Amino acid sequence: MPSALVRALNERAHLPVVDETNIDAFLAPAAGEPDNAVLFFTGDPAQRPEADDVAVVLPELMQVFRGRLRGAVVRRATEDKLKARFNVVVMPSLVVTRRDQPVGVLGKIRDWSEYVEKISAWLSPDVPVMVSSGGPKVEITHAGKEIAR
């Protein structure tokens, strides 16, 4: 269950909640909408209390980048299915996208100036999109037998 601050992003800030069924539609901008979006991966607020801090910062970022950035909250139950696609390693994270491609990820809570500096840079049309890592590259073995990949 999301915290009250995360719920308020939908209720008060009118940020949509996206999941695997509607994220592609959200990331495809309608006529007149910016190509860039920010996705909020909250993680479990009970285990990651800084998610509430990011939930307070996000509406302020939306104000600063009004007209240049759209925002959405990723449904908690869907985060594990979507995090590899958007290069999310830690939670909470804000993912800045250009259409359906990530251009940057900010994990945990950051200093305000870092948010503004990095997001400003990522909104440039010249910034390359991130390449998915394809998952972990570590192989765990025991006595010569593969036990996990």
UniProtKB/Swiss-Prot annotation:
Q: Which InterPro entries match?
A: NiFe-hyd_mat_HyaE, Thioredoxin-like_sf
Q: Which cysteine-cysteine pairs are annotated as disulfide bonds in the entry?
A: none
Q: Which domain of life does this protein belong to?
A: Bacteria
Task: Output the Pfam families linked to this UniProt entry.
Answer: HyaE
Sorted alphabetically, which SUPFAM superfamilies does this protein's record hold? Answer: Thioredoxin-like
As for family, the record states: Belongs to the HupG/HyaE family.
Record-given protein name? Hydrogenase expression/formation protein HupG
Q: Which source organism?
A: Rhizobium leguminosarum bv. viciae
